[in-house]
């Protein structure tokens, strides 16, 4: 009985007969045919194929599209810095933002502490 069951599992056919010869076991092959999702590059919006796929900060890029926003040098996963969804080489990131001492100001945005100061002023005028 174990030999017949093992033989039934080893045969690629869809039907296998048991040891008595009159019982039939139905077998079906199940294939996982998942539709492949087309991934698009965050930089150029074109299809990214698995061989050229690179993921940085949960965004998908072509290897050739993953470059510094300032100098357009090709980046690697170990040689980039990201801020607000923009990618930079480490030298330009330091040059552009470290000199200011405040990353938000370097990006031309309001300082985070200024946003809180406006809320305190607004709440102070309402209670007074």
Curated annotation (Swiss-Prot):
Outline what the protein does.
Acts as an activator of the protein-kinase ILK, thereby regulating cell motility.
User: Does Cell inner membrane show up as a keyword for this record?
Assistant: no
Which residues are recorded as binding Zn(2+) 2? 68, 71, 89, 92
Q: Could you state one GO biological process linked to this protein?
A: actin filament bundle assembly
User: What name does UniProt use for this protein?
Assistant: LIM domain-containing protein 2
Question: Which parts of the sequence are annotated with region: Disordered?
Answer: 1-25
InterPro entries attached to this UniProt entry: LIM_LIMD2, Znf_LIM
Q: Which organism is it from?
A: Rattus norvegicus (Rat)
